[in-house]
Amino acid sequence: AMEEDYSSNLNLDNINKILGVSISKDQYENNEVAGVVTGLAWTQFGGDILFIESALSKGKGNLSITGNLGKVMKESATIALEFIKSNSDDLSIKLETLTKHNIHIHVPEGATPKDGPSAGITMLTSLVSLFTQKRVKSKLAMTGEITLRGKVLPVGGIKEKILAAKRAKIR
């Protein structure tokens, strides 16, 4: 392979030439559709935003969860779905929709491991949005653990998450 020579001085003028154009995930191109919701996450490098996508397909009510998620995050998805099943009448969701369709929840950037309870409210909102076909504003982001009774519990990393929201121009 051919090597290119670069100046050893890194500055704003040559950083893109050396490293390439930065990849920004501060915005999601198809975020204003039912079932797609913005969440806030804590990482070892600070706060970040993530997107939860939900989809339905014909089936028997099976739940699939993808995106390199850990055990706690998968449990949050199960809790979200069980809350919806228990409260389908109050949410104006037909129970038939839940039993005659498979539900898929995906958190993009599958190469990045993700875990923790704080995406629970985002998963719940994504599913309710999908089932009711009501879109969630793209400039709305959320974080919080949910319980089977629908309570939102406090989570950590709030300062970092707020800074991530600000970087993503979420008010």
Language model segments and positions:
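Peripheral, non-AAA+ core regions of ATP-driven protein-machinery
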Residues: 4-15, 19-38, 44-171
